[in-house]
C-alpha cells in the first residue's frame, strides 16, 4: 500500500501539469499483485496497464509474486477512492498521439502487446523496464526495439534502469 500512497502523491503533486505521465508501480487488484504501468494526467489516473508476460527462467522468477494480465479477475482497479480501467490494451490519447504501453518482457515474446496496440491505432509505444545488463544484450535489445517500431509503424520509447543499476 506504500506504493499506492506514493503514486497518489505523485498524481496529486503533478495535477497542474498538462503532461501525460507514465510510471511503473506494483499494485494490488483484489487479492492479486500486479506489475503495472499507471498513466495519469492533470491529477487524474487514466488507466493501469498490467504486465502481460512474466518471465520464469534464469534469474527472472516473476510468477512467484505477480499475476499476468491474462489471469486477472477484474477489468477495473480501485486506486485511492476511484475505479480506473485495468487492461493491457489501453490506449491513451494526448493531442494527436495515441499511446500504448507494455512492460519489459512483453516486448520479447513472439507477438508483443504493442502489435495489438498498433492495430488498434497506437502510434507511440512506451515500454517500462528494469532490465539487467549482459554482454551483447544491449545490441540485441536495440535491434528488437527498432524492428518492433518498424512493424508497428509507431515510435517506440524504451525506459529502463541505468547502467550498473543493481536494485
Predicted regions and their residues:
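Enzyme catalytic cores with a strong preference for nitrogen-chemistry domains
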Residues: 1-167
